[in-house]
């Protein structure tokens, strides 16, 4: 089954799994999804992820979700740039999420990164989603 917006699919799977207090969730594997998950892992929003190869040849990413005192670490995850309405931001206009308590994940010419890393690298790009 193909999906038209893999980032929205990934975000929805994470959000739904956390609402059901699942410890792990699987998603179809891709380089872009792995890059997004690497950012979420480095920022401390998920425990980790692993690529699982199936006998049929397709691979999946198994995401280990993170909880603190029984509550999900990700309180809010929201898509910003959508296929029908792309949102781009220069370095000067990168959004701050809840006064810096959350992050924006961007797709830049230097790869997918968090907003503070983009400021340090002095690059702007497409604002994929925000996490708090």
UniProtKB/Swiss-Prot annotation:
Part of the 30S ribosomal subunit. Contacts proteins S5 and S12. PROSITE patterns: RIBOSOMAL_S8. The keyword Ribosomal protein applies. Belongs to the universal ribosomal protein uS8 family. It holds the Pfam family Ribosomal_S8. GO terms for biological process: translation. Keywords: Ribonucleoprotein, Ribosomal protein, RNA-binding, rRNA-binding. It comes from Afipia carboxidovorans (strain ATCC 49405 / DSM 1227 / KCTC 32145 / OM5). One of its GO terms (cellular component) is ribosome. The keyword rRNA-binding applies. GO terms for molecular function: rRNA binding; structural constituent of ribosome. The gene is rpsH. HAMAP family: Ribosomal_uS8_B (MF_01302_B). This is Small ribosomal subunit protein uS8. One of the primary rRNA binding proteins, it binds directly to 16S rRNA central domain where it helps coordinate assembly of the platform of the 30S subunit.
């Amino acid at each position: 089954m193909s999906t038209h917006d893999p980032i929205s699919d990934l975000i929805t799977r994470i959000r739904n799994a956390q609402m059901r207090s699942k410890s792990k969730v699987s998603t179809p594997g891709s380089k872009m999804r792995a890059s997004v998950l690497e950012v979420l892992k480095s920022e401390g929003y998920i425990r980790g992820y692993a690529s699982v190869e199936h006998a049929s040849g397709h691979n999946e990413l198994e995401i280990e979700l993170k909880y603190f005192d029984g509550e999900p670490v990700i309180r809010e995850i929201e898509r910003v740039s959508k296929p029908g309405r792309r949102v781009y931001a220069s370095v000067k206009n990168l959004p701050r999420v809840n006064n810096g308590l959350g992050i924006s994940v961007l797709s830049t010419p230097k790869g997918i990164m968090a907003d503070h890393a983009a400021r340090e690298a002095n690059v702007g790009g497409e604002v994929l989603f925000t996490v708090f």
